[in-house]
């Protein structure tokens, strides 16, 4: 069935460049249905190009302005489709490295790209209980943003190299580096140091054949083209990098066994909302009511242990089961079921 004929649409009607286009749910059609003319002109080649389509933008009314901005965001998301194969290869390579030992996930970048990857890094602990000791952030200018971004640091390759060496990177580590234009001297220098240390390197950029792409082992490119406001890569390029880095880390955590079905069973409940979410997950997975789930959750302290406890294991048996399964709840439950089937 042609997805464009489906009654279920990703978006019903999307205005782009003064025309209305309909998108289907199939991602291949999303990329194909983004109009290249008049949206893209002869100068619309990279993130620093000027799209003549938006000449006079400052005179447009708010509705036209928002339509243009929405079109830029939509086109950026659609540009991610072509990056999925390279993204998949990067996820597989990273999961092999990180599953084999205690390697770290190192995030590097400058400016808006650096902030995007830093945000992804900071979410890992609460969402997936990824150890803080296995996460590092190399943001140009540092993480103290109380006095602004410190944009000059983007050009400081020497500082980048020194900070990367201070981490004592090695073959067990994975370095995720982002630069919209692929030209940040800070980010390129970190990847070069990582390659020397034989760490796995994954670059996220929005330009083909960039300096960053040439030095990284895996390159994930979303060719977002010129921005609605020329050079403002916090717009379309930033959106594409947020989409792709979030997909990378999420798929990576799934591959590492931190997700059961589509539940984030490694969730660390640090507030009331997280605790309620944890109880609901336990109830759904263990197929018990929320009162029983809440009791098990309170007794065992986390989702996976509560589920295994509700399966009839003592606290000591829960620890043994999870330890033998490398923390993977699906493996632990499967082994428990197999053992019980074998019992007379």
Regions found by a protein language model. Give the residues of each.
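Gly-rich Lys/Arg/Thr-decorated short loops/hinges at beta-loop-alpha junctions or inter-strand turns
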Residues: 47-48, 68-76, 136-147, 260, ...
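Short, positively charged patches
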Residues: 48-52, 88-92, 104
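A short, well-structured juxtamembrane/interface segment
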Residues: 82-99
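Residues at the C-terminal ends
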Residues: 99-100, 196
């Amino acid at each position: 069935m042609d997805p464009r004929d489906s009654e279920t649409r990703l978006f019903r009607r999307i205005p782009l460049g003064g025309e209305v286009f309909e998108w289907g749910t199939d991602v291949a059609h999303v990329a194909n249905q983004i109009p290249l003319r008049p949206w893209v002109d002869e100068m619309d080649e990279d993130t620093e190009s000027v799209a003549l389509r938006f000449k006079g933008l400052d005179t447009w009314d708010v509705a036209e302005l928002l339509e243009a901005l929405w079109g830029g965001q939509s086109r950026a998301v659609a540009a991610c489709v072509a990056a999925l194969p390279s993204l998949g290869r990067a996820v597989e390579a990273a999961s092999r490295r990180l599953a084999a030992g205690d390697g770290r996930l190192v995030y590097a970048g400058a400016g808006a790209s650096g902030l995007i990857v830093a945000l992804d890094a900071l979410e890992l602990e609460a969402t997936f209980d990824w150890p803080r000791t296995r996460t590092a952030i190399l943001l140009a200018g540092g993480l103290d943003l109380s006095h602004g971004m410190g944009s000059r640091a983007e050009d400081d390759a020497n500082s980048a190299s020194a900070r990367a060496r201070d981490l004592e990177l090695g073959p067990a580590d994975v370095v995720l580096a982002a630069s919209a234009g692929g030209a940040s001297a800070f980010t390129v220098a970190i990847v070069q140091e990582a390659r020397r240390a034989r760490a796995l390197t994954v670059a996220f950029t929005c330009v083909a054949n960039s300096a960053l792409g040439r030095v990284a082992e895996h390159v994930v490119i979303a060719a977002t083209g010129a921005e609605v406001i020329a050079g403002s890569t916090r717009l379309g390029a930033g959106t594409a990098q947020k989409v792709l880095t979030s997909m990378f880390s999420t798929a990576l955590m799934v591959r590492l066994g931190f997700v059961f079905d589509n539940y984030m069973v490694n969730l660390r409940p640090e507030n009331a909302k997280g605790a309620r979410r944890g109880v609901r997950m336990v109830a759904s997975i263990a197929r018990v009511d929320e009162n029983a789930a809440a009791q098990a959750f309170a007794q065992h302290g986390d989702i996976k242990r509560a589920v295994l406890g509700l399966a009839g294991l003592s606290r000591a048996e829960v620890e043994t089961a999870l330890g033998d399964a490398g923390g993977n709840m699906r493996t632990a439950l499967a082994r428990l079921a197999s053992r019980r089937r074998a019992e007379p």
